[in-house]
């Protein structure tokens, strides 16, 4: 079935049909297309644009099509131009002329905008649910390891001691912001475009608010031209998905490092690891590596959407058909990554002794040494210089700050006393960092509980 016969004298060539068709990827929106059509038919009947009998006949027919697709009794014709054409054609086959009345005061331009919004509204909720599940795992693990000392890094160099729970909660905060972005994205997406028609609205006395309420939209679009031209909602959702993937990719990178024998901070469960075809000893963090790799795929989907839309004059152009494959792929990829990543993290075994051992090296407590001097009256820049000299002396002697003799300390600055050794112990370094947002164990426990409670309410 073609919806646009009449103007044309020739049949569409197979090449053109295959190239033009979107049903291989938009068929996933069959449910949304039918939901939108049921609401549209209901509105047409209530407004007297078609008879109540015709409206009821259409609705019954559409519900039958939906039931048959979902039961497998009806197969979607992959030779159809798109899912809208297939469903309208099937409806007309089943109920006759009333099926031809469905498209009154509607264009495929506003129909497809509606379908994509209906579909993506559900997907925003699905992604949010998966992100929240990951946040809960992070919060629980952070509470469990709120006293596990590890090195914090800058430039991938050991910098200052923290606790593992604090490190985990950094990702918890990132993901909480991602949830907020998803909510914002949904708020802007929640406008119903149906009634915009091709671009200039309609002469029929429709009531768009009826359709919006039936479909659960917060409001209707204000401008018919914008209603069919807009794909901001796809771009924004893809952008949020890209940011989520940035966070997952960074987390994956760290897990990959931590799993290596050079770190050995953690070990992934066998169920979330793979081996080598030639090296019997290997246990590879493939899930984390794939998440890291798939981030580029989602970024590419976002760039596809931006590039498709950047040069299109208003209103609809066929270029916009390319929006669906990109946004669908981005959604599918992120959902798959979250589905695999969360249980991988949940079952990951932490090795506290290796974290503690790593934190004991690299003069990670040097800042605390300088802070001790500052608290005892030495200007910070002088304290910084003195501590740097102590580190250099430790390197010469092959020792560390904890074991450097007090005489060496006093040779650099006579303010030093025995008390400095207590101040630079790793546990003391961490426990003293009690400023809000810091890694002191009691703060980390409280923050883990806060994040868990927030996640429970999302």
List PLM regions with ranges:
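Charged, flexible cofactor/metal-binding loops and thiol motifs
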Residues: 128, 143, 151, 157-311, ...
């Amino acid at each position: 079935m073609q919806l646009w016969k009449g103007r044309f004298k020739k049949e569409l060539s197979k090449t053109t049909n295959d190239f033009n068709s979107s049903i291989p990827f938009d068929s996933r929106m069959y449910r949304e297309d039918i939901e939108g059509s049921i609401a549209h038919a209901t509105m047409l009947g209530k407004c007297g644009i078609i008879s109540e009998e015709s409206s009821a006949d259409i609705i019954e027919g559409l519900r039958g099509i939906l039931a048959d697709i979902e039961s497998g009794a009806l197969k979607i014709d992959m030779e159809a131009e798109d899912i809208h054409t297939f469903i309208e054609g099937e409806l007309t086959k089943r109920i006759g002329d009333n099926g031809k009345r469905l498209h009154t005061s509607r264009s495929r331009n506003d129909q497809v905008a509606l379908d994509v919004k209906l579909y993506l509204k559900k997907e925003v909720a699905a992604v949010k649910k998966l992100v929240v599940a990951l946040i809960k795992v992070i919060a629980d693990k952070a509470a469990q390891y709120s006293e596990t000392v590890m090195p914090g890094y800058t430039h991938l160099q050991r910098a200052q001691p923290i606790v593992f729970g604090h490190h985990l909660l950094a990702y918890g905060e990132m993901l909480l912001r991602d949830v907020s972005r998803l909510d914002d994205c949904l708020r802007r997406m929640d406008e119903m475009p149906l009634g915009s028609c091709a671009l200039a609205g309609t002469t029929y006395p429709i009531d768009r608010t009826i359709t919006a309420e039936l479909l659960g939209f917060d409001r209707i679009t204000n401008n018919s031209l914008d209603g069919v031209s807009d794909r901001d909602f796809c771009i924004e959702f893809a952008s949020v998905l890209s940011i989520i993937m940035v966070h997952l990719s960074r987390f994956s990178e760290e897990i990959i490092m931590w799993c290596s024998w050079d770190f050995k901070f953690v070990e992934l469960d066998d169920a979330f690891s793979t081996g080598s075809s030639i090296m019997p000893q290997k246990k590879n963090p493939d899930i984390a590596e794939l998440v890291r790799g798939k981030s580029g795929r989602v970024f590419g989907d976002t760039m596809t959407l931006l590039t498709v839309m950047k040069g299109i004059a208003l209103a609809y152009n066929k270029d916009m058909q390319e929006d669906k494959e990109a946004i669908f792929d981005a959604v599918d990829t992120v959902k798959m990554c979250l589905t695999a990543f969360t249980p991988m993290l949940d079952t990951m075994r932490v090795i506290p002794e290796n974290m503690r051992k790593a934190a004991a090296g690299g003069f990670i407590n040097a800042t605390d040494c300088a802070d001790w001097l500052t608290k005892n009256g030495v200007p910070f820049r002088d304290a910084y210089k003195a501590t740097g000299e102590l580190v250099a002396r430790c390197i010469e002697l092959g020792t560390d700050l904890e074991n450097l003799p007090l005489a060496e300390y006093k040779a650099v600055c006579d303010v030093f006393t025995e008390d400095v050794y207590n101040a630079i112990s790793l546990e003391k370094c961490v426990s003293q960092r009690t400023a809000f947002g810091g890694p002191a164990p009691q703060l980390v426990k409280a923050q883990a509980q806060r994040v868990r409670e927030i996640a429970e309410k999302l």
